[in-house]
Amino acid sequence: MISLNNSFFNKRVIVNSFNNYKRSFGTKSQNEESAIVDSNHSFAHTLNLPKTTFSMKANAATREPTLLKDPYKLYKWQLENNKGENWVFHDGPPYANGDLHMGHALNKILKDIVNRYKVLKGFKVNYIPGWDCHGLPIEQQAFKKLKKSSDMKASDIRKIAGDFARKEIEKQSKGFQEMGILGDWENPYKTLDYGYEVEQIQTFYDMFNKGYIYRGVKPVHWSPSSRTALADAELEYNNNHTSKSIFVKFNVKSLSNHILNNLPTTSDINKAEMVISAIIWTTTPWTIPANQAICVNSEMDYILVKPIESEQYRNEMFIISKERLESLTKSFNIGELKVILEFKGEQLKGTITKHPQYDRESPIITGDHVIEGSGTGLVHTAPGHGVEDFQICQQQYPDLKVLSPVNDLGCFTDEVGEKFVGLEVLGDGNEAVINDLETIGSLLHKEDYIHKYPYDWRTKKPIIIRTTLQWFVGLKNIQKTALQSIERVNMVPPSGSNRLSSMIGKRTDWCISRQRVWGCPIPVLYNCKTNEPLINDESINHIKELFGKFGSDCWFEMSTQQLLPPSLKDQHENFVKGTDTMDVWFDSGTSWRGVLVERGIIDKDTGRADIYLEGSDQHRGWFQSSLLTSVCVRDIEPYKNVVTHGFLLDESGIKMSKSIGNTIVPSTVIKGGPNKVQNPPYGVDLLRTWVASSDYSKDISIGPNILIKILDGIKKIRNTLRFMLASNFDFDPTIHAIPYEKLSSLDKYALHRVFKLQESVTRHYDQFQFQKVHTEIINFSIEISSFYFDVIKRHLYAESPNSHSRRSTQTVLFKMLDVINIALAPITVHTSEDVFLHQYQFKNNGKGLDKNLIENSVFAHGWDQLPSQYENELISNQFTNIIAIRDVVNRVLQSMRSQGIIGRSDETIMELTVTNEESSPFYDNLFAINSQLDDIFCVSNVLLKKFNTFEKDVEQQQQQQQQQQQQQPQQIEPNSKGEFIFNTIISNNSKQLGRIEVLLKISDKFKCPRCWRHTSIENDKVCKPCDSVLNSLK
């Protein structure tokens, strides 16, 4: 039984369409070795042989540059000529450092696909490419050029860094334009632009005025390798970092009353001689000198234990978590630990311990952040080097002077004493602390500990927590508004919403000050006596005016007197300018204002970009910083849609890395490598097709084998396009087009399929589902080629040039080509431009279009919406059934070919016997197109019959045939008359439509020497239809 649905083919037909794909383009095969495309045929001059200069091969490396419309000129043209609404695509700025890599290509091509689609739909696309210009990597380039670090002036570093960034921008810009990226390349934005920095410091001041920005002493992520504070977004985590973990004894100086009063007196416990210690565990031994407390959980159970098998510790007892007893007994490896006393953490309050290395106390305090499962249950607390440590100490000891004895270089200061001063805390200093603890008898145990640890994302080196005076954005008061705003944003994929919300919900402060030279300065001067910041309307307006004229370099080049507002210039000796610069995420995070508002693209109070599209790492980067600054200033999110893509993997699923050597650069894919055999030049369209065909919501693989597969897909589509162009070589739609109502049922069916293609492709583009767009077009090309193209060849080639049926088919092909090419255009930019020029060759009296004119671009043509009348479900259902029958016929013909009975299908004639199920118009639908059945089934003649019953039990025969088909390829044997007969049932959506019997036999007529159909009455004579055409040509 053949079961159908409303798709173009059932599954078997789709599979067959792949096998028969080449046949639809005139490629020689057993069934299609047709003289119709043989120019040496004696009747060739009477045939409408296909012709086109559209090459089978793309020759992309050489031809694409000649086809590409200038991305900037096209961008300007659409802004001036498109009549639709504004579409604001805000570009997340890549770093102005280094050559373009495949991540750049993935990101920019995805953006360009969106923008070019919107241009075709008539929108005015606003897309201003941008670059992130500040930060350490560019500053390091300046260091390399300045020979002596002692001679480095801030102004010298900044000049070299700025020049370097501008050169990198110029290089990257050229590469992006070669990829066909549409945009305002003459006026990109740069975070070092004067106007941009003016808007940035205004945003800083607005947030300060609203109370969101403040200055304070807090623990921050500090990078000794970069010598600056870092934000969360500037960290990456090493899951296999190895730390030295230690268990340290803090001797109890005085116990809490509860424990003291309940301490038992036994023969093995001498209170006078017994030493009680609180045992802490840490993976950062270098922070022990900064310890100022020990934290426990008031609700957890703790125990006092005594080693009873260790001579070394016979006069000692340890305080540890009850839950950790078994694990710690193994770790300490000093024998059994006897439980002496059990108590709650709350009962430890009031206990005072002595710092093992310094003459100071460390009280035991309580905190909810202490949990079971690791360590000892007693947490070493160094408020100068831990966020939670700092918070708990601030709550319980507001006046505590926090110790943070580490300098900008990550070395101990003299606060720790002579034995450690100057040592690197992540190196020799760490070892020195451990050795010292061991020497004084306070080290109970040490071991390596592998865990997740934060690294500087730029230098790839570990960071530390360090308490310093910094500028922060306090997030507690805006978290609710920020989280509510995320709910209004369309996230693609939807999981991005939870991810962004989770990150913002867990964040309390954002450190925005950096101790670097190359960046936008924090526009604040400080009172020399009070250290109070000078920041008010007058000071900010004055600095804005200076930045607007001279750029932020003036902050480092001008005197304090020049930087002070007029009213305070006489007091310049009382002020000093700050040396901090802003976090690069604050730089780029204010781009909604520095670009979109400043250039008048969106309203300053309520305007939002239509879309932000970046890698998934930007949930903790640009997406977040943009949201926070916009919500702080305007109480509104800066974007309507946020689309994220994954990262790049090689063909083995391994992340691409220069150190591994598995990277591929865009230029190699486009232009080829030194060895063109090993790395051939594929061109830009292939790179863009790779992007479009990938599920960008996940990590994406690329490699030689993947590129070859992409190339095969491009060839299929290109052949489809070429067939339509070649078939319409003499078609001018302004003269030859046939009205819809006069088209054949077959042509109407083809238009219905084109309509549905356009409908689905439009939907997928609107939802940013480019992989589905690509799949739809590929499948349509294969499906339409294996059926419609197969059926229409006789009309195209053998009928008279101006016959109704030929012009009807060409009308459909023109519309079909238009829709497919326009649907492809956002992806295969160059190919679509080429097709467009060939399709409209009839323009200007056959001279075609001037390819040098922007208005002759396919993107100026627009996304023509097909008329709704093209959607014809009635005809679609009819042809769905017919195609299923054709599948049956093809299987019978294949049996005849495999047995050597025929070479071509049109050597046969066919009898198609049909029975109708009750209330089914199955036979009537076939009868309505009776005249087209021989073309549809590719045979010389079809005789349609109608009967009520068959002689055989069809259902029983169908079951036998299905069983045979499961075991081996179906082979149909002829009967005694040489006839091939096959019976089956046709059904649609489980509804039985009718039964058919297909009878195929050799035609008793002769082969027509012109069309090769076996319909001639006499040998070597043309058939009647061909004779009529020949007479019309005289």
UniProtKB/Swiss-Prot annotation:
ATP binds at residue 658. Residues 1-32 form a transit peptide. InterPro entries: aa-tRNA-synth_I_CS, aa-tRNA-synth_Ia, Anticodon_Ile_BEm, Ile-tRNA-ligase, Ile-tRNA-ligase_type1, Ile-tRNA_ligase, M/V/L/I-tRNA-synth_anticd-bd, Rossmann-like_a/b/a_fold. One of its GO terms (biological process) is mitochondrial translation. It comes from the Eukaryota. The keyword Iron does not apply. One of its GO terms (cellular component) is mitochondrial matrix. Pfam families: Anticodon_1 (PF08264), tRNA-synt_1 (PF00133). A motif ('HIGH' region) lies at residues 94-104. A motif ('KMSKS' region) lies at residues 655-659. Keywords: Aminoacyl-tRNA synthetase, ATP-binding, Ligase, Mitochondrion, Nucleotide-binding, Protein biosynthesis, Transit peptide. Its EC number is 6.1.1.5. Belongs to the class-I aminoacyl-tRNA synthetase family. This is Probable isoleucine--tRNA ligase, mitochondrial. The gene is mileS.
